[in-house]
């Protein structure tokens, strides 16, 4: 079996979601898959169709909303065909707000509407990731690969 290729598309205002994305990518690499990371402003929604697995990351703006820089990408996703494609969503959020991590939920709903197979629960990290949460992010990346394609030995 050929090594799966995963794409992480994210946006980050404070650097927290970027840090989470990098830790998840580390886990994906450690599990034996290839991974590319793109900032939302450098990504095209059509990129999602070209990869074996996709992960979207965002912070939650205000009271549960997607940030402005994700809106065009989000709307342009409507033309995609993601039937059965493994996907997951993560983000940084603030538990102070009532709709904690609402943007993560919005993206899960969109990917589900487009036919993607959400293989992991949304990962919501409160503000800056702690050392323990960074390890959780690495494990999230490993689980994304292992839950869908099996153990690393399949790719040797």
Predicted regions and their residues:
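FMN-binding flavodoxin-like domain, especially the glycine-rich phosphate-binding loop
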Residues: 2-5, 16-19, 23, 27-31, ...
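Aromatic-flanked redox-active Cys/Sec active sites in thiol-based oxidoreductases
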Residues: 10-14
């Amino acid at each position: 079996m050929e090594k799966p290729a995963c794409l992480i598309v994210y946006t980050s205002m404070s650097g927290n979601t970027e840090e989470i994305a990098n830790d998840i990518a580390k886990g994906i690499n450690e599990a034996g898959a290839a991974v590319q990371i793109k900032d939302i402003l450098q990504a095209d929604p059509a990129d999602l169709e070209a990869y074996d697995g996709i992960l979207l990351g965002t912070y939650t703006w205000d009271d549960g909303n997607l940030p402005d820089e994700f809106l065009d990408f989000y709307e342009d996703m409507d033309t995609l065909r993601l039937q059965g494609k493994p996907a997951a969503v993560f983000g940084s959020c603030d538990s102070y707000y009532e709709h904690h991590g609402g943007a993560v939920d919005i993206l899960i709903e969109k990917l589900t509407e487009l036919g993607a197979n959400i293989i992991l629960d949304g990962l919501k990290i409160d503000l800056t990731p702690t050392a323990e949460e960074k390890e959780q992010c690495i494990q999230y990346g490993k689980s994304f690969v292992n839950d869908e394609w099996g153990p690393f030995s399949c790719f040797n």
